[in-house]
């Protein structure tokens, strides 16, 4: 005799027979805790009819959730970092124009233009929050201690293998969850295996909107030419 456990509310296919209703994946069903004994001979002799049940609506991501997921790791300061183990991928929202500056308008988690004044109302000094930057790269906006935006943005892509690096506010540095690389609060590498500091972008305000512009000058953190512009 074989013992199976049935679930009374499994959102999958349910099979019925003259002997009752049961889920085809009997060995995997656990919620119901109802033990039923069925002999191998009876199982072989059953005539089964399967009927698919619908997935509850609250299990299906709505459009806003799916669009938000298209922006990789935005708002990562307040979220767990486990999901950041995925390799870096570009945002799916097309980068915005830079109002004739040659740059890109920063986008928030919903794909909206970042308005500098509004951003500063909701982000405290020392805050580092991801936005969409140049070429769609995830880029940190930095709020200085005097509650102004820093003149630079920090590209969040790890220089080791391309994971998106979260900012650890408790330790005041960026720590990559993939292989442990660490960067100081300005993105300068302080521990490998990452070989280089995080890339920079100029952060300007044009017509009230935050604009990222390519950084081609000396890296102020290292005193060297910017490797990302080579």
Swiss-Prot record:
Please state the protein's primary subcellular location: plastid
The Rieske domain, residue ranges = 116-212
By sequence similarity, the record places it as follows: Belongs to the Rieske iron-sulfur protein family.
Keyword Nucleotide-binding present in the record's keywords: the answer is no
Explain how, and how many, cofactor molecules are bound.
Binds 1 [2Fe-2S] cluster per subunit.
Q: Which cysteines are joined by disulfide bonds?
A: 163-178
| Annotated CDD domains | Rieske_cytochrome_b6f
Q: Which residues cross the membrane?
A: 73-93
Annotated [2Fe-2S] cluster binding sites: 158, 160, 176, 179
The GO terms describing molecular function are:
2 iron, 2 sulfur cluster binding; electron transporter, transferring electrons within cytochrome b6/f complex of photosystem II activity; metal ion binding; oxidoreductase activity; plastoquinol--plastocyanin reductase activity
Q: Which organism is it from?
A: Spinacia oleracea (Spinach)
State the top-level EC class.
translocase
Catalysed reaction equations from the record = 2 oxidized [plastocyanin] + a plastoquinol + 2 H(+)(in) = 2 reduced [plastocyanin] + a plastoquinone + 4 H(+)(out)
Q: Which InterPro entries match?
A: Cyt_b6_f_Rieske, Rieske_2Fe-2S, Rieske_2Fe-2S_sf, Rieske_Fe-S_prot, Rieske_Fe-S_prot_C
Q: Does the keyword Glycoprotein apply?
A: no
Q: How does it assemble?
A: The 4 large subunits of the cytochrome b6-f complex are cytochrome b6, subunit IV (17 kDa polypeptide, petD), cytochrome f and the Rieske protein, while the 4 small subunits are petG, petL, petM and petN. The complex functions as a dimer.
The domain of life for this entry's organism is Eukaryota
> EC number(s) per UniProt?
7.1.1.6
Which protein, by its recorded name, is this? Cytochrome b6-f complex iron-sulfur subunit, chloroplastic
Q: Which additional comment does the entry carry?
A: This protein is 1 of 2 subunits of the cytochrome b6-f complex that are encoded in the nucleus. The Rieske iron-sulfur protein is a high potential 2Fe-2S protein.
**Keywords, sorted A to Z:** 2Fe-2S, Chloroplast, Disulfide bond, Electron transport, Iron, Iron-sulfur, Membrane, Metal-binding, Plastid, Thylakoid, Transit peptide, Translocase, Transmembrane, Transmembrane helix, Transport
What cofactors are annotated for this protein?
A: [2Fe-2S] cluster
Chain segment of the transit peptide: 1-51
What PANTHER family does its record include?
A: CYTOCHROME B-C1 COMPLEX SUBUNIT RIESKE, MITOCHONDRIAL (PTHR10134)
Q: How does it sit in the membrane?
A: Single-pass membrane protein
As given in the record, the signal peptide range reads none
């Amino acid at each position: 005799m074989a013992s199976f456990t049935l679930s009374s509310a499994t959102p999958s296919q349910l099979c019925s027979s003259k002997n009752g209703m049961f889920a085809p994946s009997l060995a995997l069903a656990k919620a119901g805790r109802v033990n039923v004994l069925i002999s191998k001979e009876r199982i072989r002799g059953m005539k089964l009819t399967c009927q698919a049940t619908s997935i509850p609506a609250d299990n299906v991501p709505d459009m806003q959730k799916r669009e938000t997921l298209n922006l990789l790791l935005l708002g990562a300061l307040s979220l767990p970092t486990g999901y950041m183990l995925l390799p870096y991928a570009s945002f799916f929202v097309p980068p915005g124009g830079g109002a004739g500056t040659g740059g890109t308008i920063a986008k928030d988690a919903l794909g909206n233009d970042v308005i500098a004044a509004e951003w500063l109302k909701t982000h405290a000094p020392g805050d580092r929050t991801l936005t969409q930057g140049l070429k769609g790269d995830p880029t940190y906006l930095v709020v200085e201690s005097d509650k102004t935006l820093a003149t630079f943005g920090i590209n969040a892509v790890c220089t080791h293998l391309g994971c998106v690096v979260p900012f650890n506010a408790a330790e005041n540095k960026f720590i990559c969850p993939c292989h442990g690389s660490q960067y100081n609060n300005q993105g300068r590498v302080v521990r490998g295996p990452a070989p280089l500091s995080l890339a920079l972008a100029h952060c300007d305000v044009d017509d009230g909107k935050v604009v990222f512009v390519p950084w081609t000058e000396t890296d102020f953190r290292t005193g060297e030419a910017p490797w990302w512009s080579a």
